[in-house]
């Protein structure tokens, strides 16, 4: 019975005791032979970990050793074998339960380099803490320098934070106890502080009242404030106007150009002259004045080389775009030959089925031109265009020809004029006579040069029908390499070779009746008369002088035509 009674409390104690862990082989370390452990030596591990801690003590020796830290104690508790099987009298196998703090389950965290034990005791940071942002911002710069400091703070906080919390709680408890003991002292102190504050507030309030009464808003202050506000407003208004000015050209019509330029004239700062040739309008822009409108035309109505009316439009027919030859004919000059009309006249040909045909001009010659056969019309149109070109070149050649002429007729005219100047009483009569002769001379010269231009620019068939045969020309005196190379009389005449022979053989008065007909008989009759009159007045040889002047005018005419045609 005693055995059963003795066994009963033993079984109860065994049930209350924790379950026994399996037996582990305990080993010892050479540096620490008195400690028993399984696995790693906790003392050696603590010594290695203490190397990272700069404030840690030197490695403990067997003779003098400081008490281990909490991390060392926790490591020893984890790695030391259980003492359920054996009871050591030294007490090294069991750790006192009161020395260890109470372990509680917390949130999971990732720890390295001894941060696990410090993270459990480190207080949670608030959201308004700025240290985290600063660390993240300066992490790439101060990472190496701040790692050691963070580790030191973590290790120190593992021990010191607990002590601080305990001391704060103790201070709070002491304050509560003192408050319970002496409540009257606190009330008296508070009442005395409130009274002092009221005394301080009263003079401040009185001072504010006095200051507000003495200082009243004056008219000057009001005016100054008004002017300052007005100045600020004016500055803002100026800025707003500048912004609007900048926005206006951006929002303008015409691809960034101001609206005033369109239809009114150019208003930009570009002062260089601009010239443009268009099929529908004529524009000359010099400086800021421009005339760019299809309604205004500077072209005089005229008949072109192909028979179309160029100039102002009519209701019956829409004109064709101007050709390249119209550039030469643009100059509105007075017609000396009186063959091309200056104003169009519409003459419809009667007929029920025939369309309306526009016939410009009012002279009989123009009507004959449009009602005649097409072959003669083609030749006459070419002659007319060439006569217009000759008039253009005549303006530039009058001065040079009058100053550099070498003919006998011109010299005789000059000598006659000098003699007339010497005789004062017969000056008016002789001057009138010689002026009439000079006019006839110029008229005949113009007609002769017109015929030359018409021959040079007409078709090859017309040229060969009115000129000598090619073998005779090649075998003649003036035949040269230029004539053999080119099959055109234009280059041959412009070069100047053989012009006298051709003139004498073609245009002499003897051959005039011998089958060589002219296009315009009236100018040729004038030339015959003037040749006879000028030959009698100047002593003969007038034909040679006219031939030289015609050759010069021919060369000048070709050069001017080339200049004008370069515009395209």
From Swiss-Prot:
Main location: membrane
Modifications after synthesis and translation: Phosphorylation at Ser-260 amplifies the promotion of protophloem differentiation.
Biased amino acid composition, Low complexity: 82-93
Post-translational modification Phosphoserine, affected residues: 260
Annotated Polar residues bias: 400-423
Biased composition, class Acidic residues, residue ranges: 168-179
Record localization: Cell membrane; Cytoplasm
Topology versus the membrane: Peripheral membrane protein
Region (Disordered): 1-27, 78-99, 168-203, 242-276, 360-428, 446-512, 526-558
Ranges of Gly residues composition bias in the record: 532-546
UniProt biased composition (Basic and acidic residues): 180-193
Organism superkingdom: Eukaryota
Keywords: Cell membrane, Cytoplasm, Developmental protein, Differentiation, Membrane, Phosphoprotein
InterPro entries assigned: OCTOPUS-like
One Gene Ontology term from the biological process aspect of the record: phloem development
A Pfam family assignment: DUF740
Primary role: Potentiates primary root protophloem differentiation. Regulates roots architecture.
Name of the featured protein: Protein OCTOPUS-like
